[in-house]
Amino acid sequence: MFYFSHLLRDEEMKEVIQETGMGVESIEFSIAENLDNFSKTLLSYEKRLGKMGCEKLLLHGPFLDLNPVSYDLSIRNVTMKRYEEAYQAAKALGAKKIVYHTCYVPDFYLLIGWAERMAEFYREFLYEKDNSIELVMENVLDRIPQPMAEVAEKIEHPAFGLCLDVGHANCYSKVSCEEWFQTEKKYLKHLHLHDNKGDRDSHLPLGTGTISGNVVRGILQEEQVKTCTIECSTQEAILASFYGAKKLFENKRTDNREEKQ
């Protein structure tokens, strides 16, 4: 199932939904001010989704100034609070999945003990939660995929998984997108799709940067990766990426039929 980020005006969102049938990944509850005005934001956004004709929803969780593995208990507690508020928004709006960043900053945080502390945070966060909403952890500035895979391995909860952002992997990491995929594929539940030329996080349409279409196609072939979000900031870029990704996905289905014959 394809989704696209709510980075357009609502009227443009409506047009894209009508043309493609895609769902929406909302950033509305990643913003602290909106979480501070939770009830008002929830009511307002629910109405906006209705006007857009959105029938399928994912949420992107908060991340600015937060750190799940902070040694400062106050910061950790605020992170837990903000994550919980976004989770409750997902529950109220019927979202099926919520994306959280690792919040890792290279050269500032050590990776020694990082996976253990992150797993401890999410075990606490997921305590007594069911699997009606999937939680996926997304790479951003992360340079290597192994620590994220270690976190997923340590968390024994059916709702937890990983989100591979191929654009972030392409520009912030020297490890290839293919290696990111191979390292994380056992735990992948979601995909963020956009392109760049490897120099900055430019969120270009698929096929206009340096990310291999064959790699994207290979990821789409994984049965557990049932959802992906197109993260571009213009209507034209979103539509170009959607039709490009759809073609890759349809090639997947053709290949599967040929294998069965």
Language-model features and meaning:
Residues 38-44, 75-83, 113-120, 149, ...:
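Charged helix-capping and loop-helix junction motifs
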